[in-house]
Curated annotation (Swiss-Prot):
Residues 841-934, 936-1021, 1024-1123, 1126-1212 form the IPT/TIG domain. Residues 1240-1294 form a coiled coil. It comes from the Eukaryota. GO terms for cellular component: plasma membrane; semaphorin receptor complex. The chain crosses the membrane at residues 1221-1241. This is Plexin-A3. Residues 20-1220 are extracellular. The gene is Plxna3. The keyword Disulfide bond applies. Coreceptor for SEMA3A and SEMA3F. Necessary for signaling by class 3 semaphorins and subsequent remodeling of the cytoskeleton. Plays a role in axon guidance in the developing nervous system. Regulates the migration of sympathetic neurons, but not of neural crest precursors. Required for normal dendrite spine morphology in pyramidal neurons. May play a role in regulating semaphorin-mediated programmed cell death in the developing nervous system. Class 3 semaphorins bind to a complex composed of a neuropilin and a plexin. Disulfide bonds join 78-87, 113-121, 267-388, 283-339, 357-376, 492-509, 498-540, 501-518, 512-524, 575-595. GO terms for biological process: axon extension involved in axon guidance; axon guidance; branchiomotor neuron axon guidance; facial nerve structural organization; gonadotrophin-releasing hormone neuronal migration to the hypothalamus; hippocampus development; motor neuron axon guidance; negative chemotaxis.
Length: 1872
């Protein structure tokens, strides 16, 4: 069932300058995607097409009906669809995407066309969506199987009395032979009629359709026509299309696809399509072309627009949206434009084109359809506007683009859909955008298009193409992928003033005056009265009031209100001030109003706390409507709030300053006497500006200030004072007023603490009468300064501000005033003195200290007393002149100079030498540092390659690269952006390559030196691309994993993934796995609103930062979705939850499973007391098993970078038993134990024989199995959680299947990864010719049989040789598997005959590989069962491998012996109690330090290598083993704090040695704690490591021969333990158990012929845990139809062959036939694959996993055996382990063989066809010449024997095969 929810009120905010919000209705879906919309033109009902659904909604968007259309079993390659004919391709449920939704009004039905079954349509009844019909049995019923929902357009043309016609255009997705791109079809009344959708006209030459020619698709495979919009105007049908611009695409060197827009026109009554014309169409604005049509709408122009265009008002016009340029059709640029076309203009262009063609001018110009240029034929005739074509001069293409009239451009939102209608005299256009907005545009002329409103509808989600009006045009319906929205066409009520209303530009809106609201004219009660409804801005009411301000001390002032544009007010008006006061107004004869100002009491309420002025609104209230309909601002002013004379008299209101009272008043008579009143700024007392007031510290002096209008203190008033505030302290100094223009602060000195500043600003003011300040100008400053502060040297002193008058006191060596220096005439130096210069210059530093001898280096010299001007300083550096740069000179402190070239061949180092003025001793100095000339060199660049777009961080290595002052790195002709440098390396960012992928030289420019090296070349490669993301969603917080597929990813150094949402960009880290894959953590996004939508948020941009590759910054086709973050409820109100040990804990939450498509899920980790628990996840809760510990344990949930602390679990065990109960139980138990003991003793004496011992053993096994059932159940549940988590992240491709080639080579040539058959053979021409002749000879059955039999007859032809020859033969015959199969059958028949002749038991046939035929049989199955492995059997085998690996790694595994706590193999079982703890380490991902840490479970007893393997397994989960780093290539780094980092190793100087035993290090050895932070870093080779590595290599060499003979090819790692004891060094390594202990224990164990109970318990527990996975694998292998896969033909064919051979030889024993089949398939193929899953998957198999798989393989073999399964006390434990299961498995095998025997036989012809197809699929996987060369080795070795055999065989003699072989031998010999 579908899930939809109706949200009748969903608020949004309009953009631009508007800020109100209005509700609108929506219809939202969550489990489908909406594609199309239709609105009934009468009823207003809304029909919505979607993926797998069609909805019917009421006009208010209430859901009325829903009709299900899919998913349907289908396959895109099935034609006709599977409903009509059985399809050979696999059928799967396919979504039905609605591509066309039309209302057939004449037949009262809905036409809904989808994508399934090659694009069939359904007819639905309008009333209830009942399916009236679904024609699908004729080819005309299939419109197109293309999946794009918006590539089809249709128009229904009603024909009065006759049936309607459907004109439909569609993309055909390359299948032009099946579907016409444009056609005219019949709409029959009977929906099931065979004639439904038949072409309107069709004969053998002409039909009413257009098809894309196959020649066009051959030339341009991507060619297609996408139909955007269709409509009818007058007697014509039009379509707007997008199609490939073949000319532009052909000319583009970069391979870009270009598209062009065209308008297609045909006569509606033209059944032969003779009238077909298409014209390019587009728009241009400011010189930029817009050629990608997005949407269009046919409408009538408003009167104003029609007049501006000069067309009639009933003329059709076409509003069209175009995107900029011609590229990126699927995700076009956001630069878009709204354009206008008149149909009369389009038709005129078409008419002129037809007329010119009928005059014989030019060609038909339609290359995509005609594939050649056909000339127009001169045919004189009258062509008018309704001409519908003839059989000639058609179809016709336009030569020039029909240009539209640009109306509105947009570069941000991306306009995507358009609708328009006429309101009054205006054309109103509505535009949907890709950012989810609705734009409203008023178009009144070609230059008069005004965007007047933008409404946010579905922010960040594109509005789709269908944009439709309700029948009354009061609402508009918008469609997005998840939502239908109904918006009113206007929301006038949002405008709250007349100016806002009439200035908005919305033509629907006017101002209802007495109602004081914005609305349509029809909604205004008094609209018909004069001035009752305003529609123009100058018609708004204008109000003025006289006076417009009043003092707060005045009341009852009569105010006169004048008004314009007011309606009749005779029913009365009242005046109000902010609802505080209201009074009735008097209407004067002049039309003015008279109102009183508020009373004093009301004024206090209005103005209290508002300072000097308060503006209030004087409002007019209509007695007729009770509404305040107009208003004007009115000011109340308060002079007394102004505190200074200047602010008082500068006020715009009548305020006066009382000078002697120091107050401001609105009443001048309040001043005490006349001369104290000031009413202008010129009369204010004020300190006059005179520059800064400079005050030296510690100098006793008066301060005289100029002023004006200084008042004379009167009797009783205090005198003047100067108030100085410095460092928080206030000083008052008496002052004297000399006159009204002068005041002097008396003698005083001033100080400030500290010498950190040379001067400080004072807060300085002049006051009188205690606290009356004199006004100061804003620029007035008082500075207090110290000469000596921050001026310790002469040079610094002389460069001080000259206004301070500071100078250098020579004898005091101090900067001070002249008055403080003794004998200043000769002892005090000031810059004003002529020739003043400081002696004893000193250089403290020079930089740089090295530079090229070519010069150009800018040397910076820092010191003191380095002159006062650059002109007086002379410089030489290392004996070379250095020219001062005046602009860089800092007086006395710093000189920057540029070195000249040194002319000395090898100049020595030298100091910098400086003279000030002259070079006498006192004015000369040199530096202690020496400057050296060097010759920089360039050695190499790393990396050596990077993307052509640049952005790669390059490290350029060499010598002396830090020399000089400036460095520029040039790569070909672009500058590499400098980052940093040192002596050995320069780091810079590569520029873009102007030549694309190519090699570029590198040149270093260091100052004036240019350095290059011919051997240092940087290679620009193809830019990396991103092709696929999995999954395409995250949560708002991000930090979930994304697997990214692409190309050239290894060229990127620091990839990051980015998202941009609402203008805010976020990034996260990526880790490159290989050239085509990387793992990223999704970036989070910041929401502007508190709650994200359930259906998800789409970022504005989503892409990748791949160096400077711009194309990846925003993925064109990305539909990345962010779903709400999960949230959790706390554990009860108190945050504490009481539970019992082991019971389930339910954690409730929301959004736990995002509503995303696909199988990907969030990864949750629940920690209880720091320990993870097994989880079951649903949408609203996590089900978690609490751990067995007790007490209070905190609960934390981790997901996607989020951490949730939910509270505390209080885990309490049941109360202990009471003492009497315990005594009673103990006594009862003792008696019971005694009774059992007596019985067992008696029983033992009576049961001595072996059978009874067996039964007792079996009984013990059963009892033990029951006893460990609970343990098994718990272990299985935990493992099941792990496996479920694993399978949740596995999606077909994520099972790391090896490719066919690698798989085949691993089985055919085990242990040889790089076999010669995988490589090209480099050989002389003669030898190559000979090998090709040898290959032809192998295709002679007589020769090949003789060749193989001869080799087998040789005593030196070893078992290994037999296998090699069999494999090489199969490879050589890979392209002829039919021939190879016949040969194999003959060899098997010969082998059976030989077996029977030698009197061997028939059951021994195929048991061992003693012949070439047996190995060939294995290889034959290997080739032919590969598909079955990938599609069916591979998954359970992979899950079994994963289950074994995970179960083994949950307990300790000995790194030396390979023994484990959990094992299926008795030989690999640890027989001691090992104490261990589980740790969770937080691992920093390799190569991506900034990414999120990964929690990894390890054991504290794990060796370091074991821990590294577990870390790598987790960090690189899902990555094939060959594509990830290896443990031996990485170091494990334990990070403790910011700086402490410890490298952990299996052996180091801390390794413990006791006697001659050395214990390898574990995590416990290093005391690594739970929760530790670790990192995997590239291997650091130290002297110790190198020595260790050498010792280790020597140790391994002793095992090499043994390992090479092993069946597993997975290198040394699969069989060898991780570490090998170094016996040569005299010490033995051990990990968990010592070898001798283990040996002793085993000896005793085998002596008793039994495994002790504790060890057997572990075997049983492991077996029980893995039981389901073993069962699944066996069930899959022994089933004839499993998981939807049929039995492979090869099995049935070979089993039938064996039955035939048995029949021919009269072998009737069913056990023999059973055994032959078991030896043939399970033993030869399946056992090999089960024991060696690395043959099938890209994985690593360690020794303990290998041992367990061997037990499973043995059980598999036992299940196929026909012999009785006898067990005894000497039986191995693994047979005892599966004793109860094997009978059941045997029944499966017997049933499997029976079912195969019952199947219909496969004919040789059918089998040959199958084998030929298999040969074709893999014909080029191996190099046949290499295989022939390897095979020819045996010809050389046994040359004489083979030639003799060829002579003896009659058939060989007949065909002269000996001579042919000798010819080959001669050819080979001649080249040696």
């Amino acid at each position: 069932m579908h899930t939809v929810c109706l949200l009748p009120l969903l608020f949004f905010t309009i953009g631009g300058c508007l800020g109100s919000s209005r509700p609108f209705r929506t219809f939202v879906v969550t489990d489908t995607t909406l594609t199309h919309l239709a609105v009934h033109r009468v009823t207003g009902e809304v029909f919505v097409g979607a993926v797998n659904r069609v909805f019917k909604l009421a006009s208010n968007l209430t859901e009325l009906r829903a009709h299900v259309t899919g998913p349907i079993e289908d396959n895109a390659r099935c034609y006709p669809p599977p409903s009509m004919r059985v399809c050979s391709h696999r059928l799967v449920p396919v979504d039905n995407v609605n591509k066309l939704l039309l209302i057939d009004y004449a037949a009262r039905r809905l036409v809904a066309c989808g994508s399934i079954w090659q694009g069939i349509c359904q007819f639905l009844r309008l009333d209830d969506l009942f399916k009236l019909g679904e024609p699908h049995h004729r080819k005309e019923h299939y419109l197109s199987g293309a999946q794009e929902p918006d590539s089809m357009a249709g128009v229904i043309v009603e024909q009065g009395q006759g049936p309607s016609k459907l004109f439909v255009g569609t993309a055909v997705d390359g299948k032009s032979e099946y579907f016409p791109t444009l056609s005219s079809r019949k709409l029959i009344d009977d929906e099931d009629s065979g004639d439904m959708f038949s072409l309107v006209y069709q004969d053998e030459f002409v039909s009413s359709q257009i098809k894309i020619p196959s020649d066009t698709l051959s030339l341009y495979p991507a060619f297609d026509i996408y139909y955007i919009y269709g409509f009818v105007s007058a007697s014509f049908v039009y379509f707007l299309t997008l199609q490939l611009d073949t000319q532009q695409t052909l000319l583009d060197t970069a391979g870009e696809k270009f598209f062009t827009s065209k308008i297609v026109r045909m006569c509606a009554g033209d059944s032969e399509f003779y009238s077909y014309v298409e014209f390019p169409i587009g728009c241009s604005w400011r010189g930029v072309e817009y050629r990608l049509v997005q949407s269009a709408h046919l409408a009538k122009p408003g009167l104003l627009l029609a007049q501006a265009l000069g067309v009639p008002a009933d003329e059709d016009v076409l509003f069209t949206i175009f995107s900029q340029g011609q590229k990126n059709r699927a995700n076009p640029p956001r630069q878009t434009i709204l354009c206008l076309f008149t149909l009369s203009s389009i038709n005129a262009h078409i008419r002129r084109r037809i007329q010119s063609c009928y005059r014989g001018e030019g060609t038909l110009a339609l290359p995509w359809l005609l594939n050649k240029e056909l000339p127009c034929i001169n045919t004189p005739m009258q062509i008018n506007g309704n001409f519908c074509g003839l059989v000639l001069n058609q179809p016709l293409g336009g030569l020039h683009v029909i240009e539209g009239l640009p109306l509105l451009a947009d570069s941000t939102d991306g306009m995507a859909s358009v609708a328009a209608y006429t309101y009054h005299q205006h054309s109103v256009v509505f535009i949907g955008t890709r950012s989810g907005n609705l734009k409203k545009v008023r178009v009144d002329g070609s230059q008069d298009a005004q965007l007047y409103e933008t409404v946010s509808v579905v922010q960040g989600t594109p509005i789709l193409r269908d944009l439709l009006f309700s029948p009354d045009h009061r609402h508009i319906y918008l469609l997005s992928e998840k939502q239908v929205s109904q918006l009113p066409v206007e929301t006038c009520e949002q405008y709250l003033s007349c100016a806002a209303c009439l200035g908005s530009g919305d033509p629907h809106c006017g101002w209802c005056v007495l109602q004081h609201r914005c609305c349509r004219e029809g909604a205004c009660p008094g609209a018909s009265a004069p001035h009752g409804f305003a529609e123009e801005l100058n018609k708004c009411i204008q109000v003025r009031v006289r006076p417009n301000n009043v003092s707060v001390t005045s009341s009852g002032v009569q105010l006169t209100v004048a008004m314009r544009n007011v309606p009749d007010l005779s029913l009365g008006v009242s005046c109000s001030f902010e609802e505080v006061t209201e009074s009735e107004a008097i209407l004067l004869p002049s039309g003015e109003l008279r109102c009183p100002s508020p009373s004093l009491q009301e004024l206090q309420t209005l103005t209290r706390g508002h300072g000097a002025t308060h503006t209030v609104r004087l409002q007019l209230l209509s007695m007729e409507t009770g509404v305040r309909f107009a208003g004007v601002d009115f000011v109340f002013y308060n002079c007394s709030a102004l505190q200074s004379c200047m602010s008082c008299v500068g006020s715009p209101y009548p305020c006066h300053w009382c000078k002697y009272r120091h107050v401001c008043t609105s009443h001048p008579h309040e001043c005490s006497f006349q001369e104290g009143r000031v009413h202008s700024p010129e009369g204010c007392p004020e300190i006059l500006p005179r520059g800064d007031l400079l005050i030296p510290v510690g100098v006793m002096q008066p301060l005289t200030l100029r002023a004006k209008n200084l008042p004379q203190p009167q009797s009783g008033q205090k005198n003047y004072e100067c108030v100085v505030r410095v460092q928080g302290r206030q000083h008052r100094v008496p002052a004297v007023r000399f006159n009204s223009s002068s005041v002097q602060c008396q003698n005083a000195s001033y100080f400030y603490e500290g010498d950190e500043f040379g001067d400080t600003e004072l807060d300085f003011s002049v006051v009188w009468d205690g606290d009356f300040p004199i006004d100061k100008p804003p620029s007035f400053r008082a500075l207090l300064y110290k000469c000596w502060a921050q001026r310790p040297s002469c040079g610094l002193c002389l460069k001080a501000d000259p206004r301070f008058n500071c100078g250098w006191c020579i004898s005091e060596h101090r900067c001070q005033l002249r008055v403080h220096c003794p004998a200043p005439k000769s002892n005090w130096m000031h810059p004003s003195q002529k020739g003043a210069r400081c002696s004893h210059p000193r250089i403290t530093q020079i930089h740089p200290l090295t530079g090229p001898k070519e010069g150009g280096t800018r040397v910076t010299i820092v010191g003191e007393n380095l002159g006062l001007t650059s002109r007086e300083v002379g410089l030489r550096v290392a004996g070379v002149r250095c020219n001062s740069i005046p602009t860089e000179y800092v007086s006395a402190e710093r000189i920057v100079c540029e070195m000249e070239e040194s002319l000395v061949p090898s100049p020595p180092p030298g100091p910098a030498e400086l003279c000030v003025g002259d070079c006498s001793a006192d004015f000369r100095t040199q530096s202690q540092q020496l400057y050296s000339f060097v010759t920089p060199t360039l050695d190499r660049v790393s990396p050596t390659r990077g993307p052509a777009s640049g952005g790669t961080r390059l490290t350029i290595s060499g010598t002396s690269l830090d020399a000089g002052s400036r460095v520029t790195v040039i790569i070909r002709d672009g500058e590499c952006q400098f980052v940093r440098r040192d002596a050995e390396a320069i780091v810079c960012i590569s520029p873009i390559s102007t030549l694309g992928p190519s090699q570029a030289p590198i040149i270093l420019a260091i100052d004036h030196a240019n350095i290059s090296s011919t051997g240092v070349i940087y290679t620009y490669t193809q830019d990396p691309t991103v092709t696929h993301l999995e999954p395409t969603w995250s949560i708002i917080n991000g930090s979930t994993s994304i697997t990214v597929s692409g190309t050239h990813l290894l060229t990127v150094q620091e990839p990051r993934v980015r998202a941009k949402y609402r203008g805010i960009e976020t990034t996260n880290t990526c880790q490159v796995i290989n050239d085509t894959a990387m793992l990223c953590k999704a970036p989070g996004i910041f929401l502007g609103h508190p709650q994200p939508r359930a259906q998800g948020e789409h970022p504005d941009e989503f892409g990748f930062l791949l160096d400077h590759v711009q194309a990846a910054r925003s993925l064109n086709r990305s539909s990345f979705t962010y779903y709400p973050d999960p949230s959790f409820e706390p554990l009860g109100p108190s945050g504490v939850l009481d539970v019992k040990p082991g019971s389930h804990v339910v954690l409730k939450g929301k959004n736990l499973i995002p509503a995303a498509a696909g199988s990907s899920r969030l990864n949750y980790t629940v920690l209880i007391g720091g320990q993870p628990c097994a989880l079951t996840v649903s949408d609203t809760q996590l089900l978690c098993d609490s751990p067995s510990q007790t007490g209070r344990q905190p609960v934390m949930v981790l997901v996607g970078g989020l951490e949730f602390w939910l509270g505390t679990l209080h885990i309490t065990a049941d109360r202990a038993l009471t003492l009497p109960a315990m005594v009673g139980l103990a006594a009862g138990g003792g008696l019971l134990l005694l009774a059992i003991t007596v019985v067992l003793v008696a029983y033992k004496r009576k049961t001595q024989d072996a059978d009874r011992t067996l039964k007792r053993l079996q009984l013990q096994m059963d009892n033990l199995e029951s006893r460990v059932a609970l343990e098994c159940k718990e272990a299985f549940a935990e493992l099941q959680t792990d496996i479920n988590e694993l399978t949740n992240h596995m999606d077909g491709v994520q099972i790391p299947f090896l490719d066919y080639r690698t798989y085949a080579v691993r089985v055919l040539f085990p242990g040889i990864e790089a076999h010669p058959v995988l490589k090209e053979l480099d050989t002389p021409p003669n030898v190559e010719k000979a090998l090709r002749l040898f290959g032809q000879l192998l295709h002679s059955r007589a020769f090949l049989l003789t060749f193989i039999h001869t080799l087998e007859a040789q005593s030196s032809f070893s078992m290994r040789d037999r296998g090699t020859v069999a494999s090489l033969t199969m490879v050589a015959l890979q392209s002829r598997l039919d021939y190879a199969t016949g040969l194999l059958k003959q060899l098997l028949a010969d082998l059976i005959e030989k077996n029977l002749e030698s009197k061997n038991h028939p059951k021994l046939l195929l048991r061992r590989t003693e012949s070439v035929a047996e190995k060939m049989l294995t290889n034959w199955f290997t080739f032919l069962l590969h598909k079955f492995l990938k599609e069916c059997a591979g998954e359970p085998l992979f899950l079994l491998y994963c289950a074994i690996k995970q179960q083994m790694e949950k307990g300790p595994i000995d790194a030396i012996t390979g023994e484990a706590r959990y094992s299926l193999s008795e030989d690999k079982l640890i027989r001691q109690q090992i104490d261990y703890k589980t740790l969770t380490l937080h691992c920093v991902c390799p190569e991506s330090e900034g990414s999120a840490q990964v929690p990894v479970k390890v054991l504290n007893c794990d060796s370091i290598t074991q821990a590294k393997d577990k870390l790598l397994d987790t960090v690189y989960k899902g990555i094939p083993y060959s594509q990830r780093p290896k443990a031996e290539d990485m170091d494990l780094e334990w990070r403790q704090g910011r700086m402490a980092r410890i490298i952990l190793q299996d052996e180091d100087i801390t390794t413990k040695i006791e006697c001659d035993w050395k214990r390898i290090n574990s995590l416990a050895h290093y005391q690594v704690t739970d929760g530790s932070l670790v990192a995997l870093v590239p291997k650091q080779v130290s002297a110790y490591n190198m020595a260790n590595s050498f010792t280790f290599t020597r140790s391994l060499s002793r095992y090499e021969s043994l390992l090479r003979a092993a069946s597993s090819p997975d290198s040394l790692r699969s069989r060898a333990p991780m570490l090998t004891p170094d016996q040569e060094a005299g010490t033995k390594l051990w990990h968990l158990v010592k070898n001798h202990d283990h040996a002793d224990h085993r000896e005793g164990d085998r002596g008793s012929k039994m495994v002790s109970e504790i060890y057997l318990t572990r075997l049983l527990a492991t077996k029980g845990t893995l039981q389901k996975f073993v069962d699944d694998l066996f069930e899959t292998v022994f089933s004839t139809a499993h998981r939807g896969s049929a039995l492979p033909l090869a099995i049935k064919y070979m089993f039938d062959f064996l039955d035939e051979q048995a029949d021919q030889r009269q072998i009737s024993d069913p056990d023999v036939r059973h055994t032959w089949k078991s030896n043939c398939l399970p033993l030869r193929f399946w056992v090999n694959v089960i024991k060696n899953p690395q043959f099938v998957f890209d994985i690593h198999k360690n020794s303990i996993t290998d041992a367990c798989l061997s037990v499973v393989a043995q059980t598999f073999m036992d299940s196929c055996s026909t012999s009785e399964h006898r067990l005894g006390k000497d039986s191995p434990s693994n047979k005892l382990l599966y004793a109860k299961d094997i009978p059941n498995y045997k029944s499966w095998v017997e049933r499997y063989y029976r079912d195969i025997a019952k199947m219909a036989s496969i004919s040789d012809q059918d089998m040959d066809a199958y084998l030929v197809e298999q040969s074709r699929l893999h014909a080029n996987d191996f190099n046949v010449l290499s295989a022939l060369s390897e095979l020819y080795f045996y010809v050389t070795k046994y040359r004489q024997e083979i030639l003799t055999s060829l002579d003896r065989d009659a058939s060989c003699r007949k065909h002269k095969l000996r001579q042919k072989l000798e010819q080959i031998i001669t050819l080979v010999s001649s080249s040696s």
